[in-house]
Amino acid sequence: MSKGIPWQDGESLTLNNSTSTSLIVSLLVRYPELASVTFDPESKDLHLVFVLSQPLEKEAFEEFQRKTDLSLGIFFELSGHEQGKIDISYLNHEKNAFIEIRCDVQTLSQEEIALLHDLVVAEFGERLVSEQEDNLGEEELEVHEAIIENMLEDLKESSRPDKTLIGFREEGRVLVFNSNPWHNKN
């Protein structure tokens, strides 16, 4: 059940879309460096994919992974948040590299997503492929962060599985599709 999100003058912003759809859209709008976001209801995993404009060397990936593990360890220790499963992998394909971060939704927080995003941006900066969105104002950023936090909480509490959804950006638009390759009828 979606909660209202605090908005202007004590009003509440309520989202009518499915929880996972709202989460995917807000993540893609809030973090323009994200190429795609997938929610897998079976495993309750969120897959965050970033694209680099050139292939990634194994050593550079291992260094990024080491820094990320260290940063997350410090984050969990200082914040007191429960440390969940986070798997990071990469794939070189032609002239690009794809970095996938899989996170367990049951323990994931908005702050953790922000940290992961910031670590990717700090490490790969100009190499990240990003659709430059209009700069969101501080208030809009806060609204999307509140939506993300609320949708994560809703997914943690939900006992009904949603559909597997994938969202990505194309020509300035955010698109979300039902994606279940195991049940395609050919």
Name each model feature, range by range.
Residues 128-186:
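Glycine-rich, aromatic-bearing surface loops/beta-hairpins
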Residues 36-44, 77-96, 129-148:
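Short glycine-rich, low-complexity/disordered patches
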Residues 55-112:
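Structured domain cores in non-transmembrane regions
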Residues 102-137:
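Ampiphathic alpha-helical segments that act as solvent-exposed interaction surfaces
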Residues 36, 47-49, 87-89, 96-104, ...:
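Ordered hydrophobic segments in well-structured contexts
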Residues 9-76:
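N-terminal interaction modules that seed assembly of large macromolecular complexes
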Residues 15, 19, 59, 63, ...:
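Alpha-helix boundary/N-cap detector
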